[in-house]
A protein has these predicted regions:
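Double-stranded beta-helix
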Residues: 3-9, 95-121
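Short beta-strand segments in beta-sandwich/barrel cores
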Residues: 41-42, 66-71, 94
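Conserved short histidine dyad/triad with adjacent acidic residue
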Residues: 33-54
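A short, N-terminal "cap"/entry segment at the start of jelly-roll beta-barrel domains
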Residues: 1-35, 43, 119-121
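Glycine- and acidic-residue-biased ligand/ion/polar-headgroup-sensing regions
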Residues: 48-74
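Short acidic-glycine-tyrosine-enriched beta hairpin
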Residues: 72-92
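A cytosolic small-molecule/anion-sensing beta-strand core signal
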Residues: 64-65, 90, 98
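Conserved GNAT-family N-acetyltransferase fold
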Residues: 34-36, 61, 86
Length: 121
């Protein structure tokens, strides 16, 4: 079966401090668009919602705009920007770099399914 949806009309939206997530759910694909404002940091904006010390969601991402810094719990770090495709396993923090909004497309599914949802929700 063919399915088409537009990011302009997501199935759900989750707001959190300094950002929001739009999720689209299709057969075999849960797709997310994350929008993060300057000053956003996962450990400050989403950790209180998730109830974990670091982000435990796996990401397969594409950066549309802005720059984001990722720091793994094991100390590994990277900065991603427009046009970058990245894989980030669970166990990390992240934050916006600079004063430009960050927009990330995430194809891994976990972000669309459970990101910024309270544990057990």
């Amino acid at each position: 079966m063919l399915e088409v949806k537009t990011v302009d009309k997501p199935d759900e939206r989750r707001d959190f401090p300094r950002g929001h997530l739009d999720a689209l759910h299709l057969t075999g694909l849960d797709f997310a668009v994350g929008t993060f404002e300057p000053g956003w940091r996962w450990s400050e904006s989403v950790a209180p919602i998730a109830g974990t010390e670091s982000c435990m969601v796996h990401h397969n991402g594409y950066v549309v705009q802005g720059r984001m810094h990722l720091r793994m719990d094991d100390g590994g770090e990277v900065e991603v920007g427009p046009g970058d495709v990245f894989v980030c396993p669970p166990g990390h923090d992240a934050w916006v770099v600079g004063d430009e909004q960050v927009v990330v497309y995430d194809f891994a599914g976990g972000m669309a399914q459970g990101y910024a949802k309270a544990a057990g929700a």
